Amino acid sequence: DKGFFAEENLQVEPQWFDAAHPIAVATASSQVDVGATGITASLFNMAASGQKLAIVADKGREQKGYSSSALIVTADNYANGVTSLEALKGKRIGITQKGSTFHYMIGRMLETKGMKLDDVQLIPLGKLSAVMAALESKQIDAAILNEPNISKVQRAGYGKMVVQVGDLIPYQTSAVFYSPNFVKNEDVAVRFMKAYNKAVNYYYDAAIAKKDAKQLAE
C-alpha cells in the first residue's frame, strides 16, 4: 500500500470475487461502490435490461507486443505438438463462465484461423483458480489465462504458452466501473479516480524501470 487513497482521504476495503459477472452484479446493485472487471456479455445484458453502472476508466486491454492474456496448453500437449490454434481441434478448453472475456477471446482467436467454437470442447469451471487447477491436473488441455497467472503456470512447469491474445485480437478487455450510488457523489468519485491514476502510474513507471518487481508481481 503506497498510500495513494489515504492521500485523497479515502479508506478502501477490497472485496474479492471468483469471476467477472458477480462483480458487475454487485456494482450495478451498489453492493460495492467500485468494480474492476471484464467487459462481458452479461454486462451488456444487464445494461440492456435497464441496470445502471458507469464505465469510468481503463483496466486492461489486449495489444500486440504486450503481455496480458495468452493461450496456455498443458506441457504434455505442447510436447505432443499442440503448438498452434489449429491443433486445438477437439481439445478441452477451460473457461471461467459462458459469456466471459475468456469465452469471447477463444472464440475470436479461433475465427482468425477459420475455426469455430464448435471445433473445441468448452469446459466452464466457474473461477480462474479452478481453471488453473484443471490445467495442472490435465482435466483440460488448454485455457486462456492472464498475468500474473501465465507466469505462475509456466514457472510451475505444467503449462506452455502458444500465443498472446493481443497478437491476434487487440481489444478492450476490462474496465473500472462506478455503482449508481457512488457515481452521484462527484467529490468522492473524483478523488477515487485521482488515487487510482496515481497507483496505475506508479505500477507503470516501476515496471518500466524494473523496480519493485516482487511487489508488482504480488
Short names for language-model regions:
Residues N77, A130-A217:
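Pocket-lining segment of extracytoplasmic ligand-binding domains
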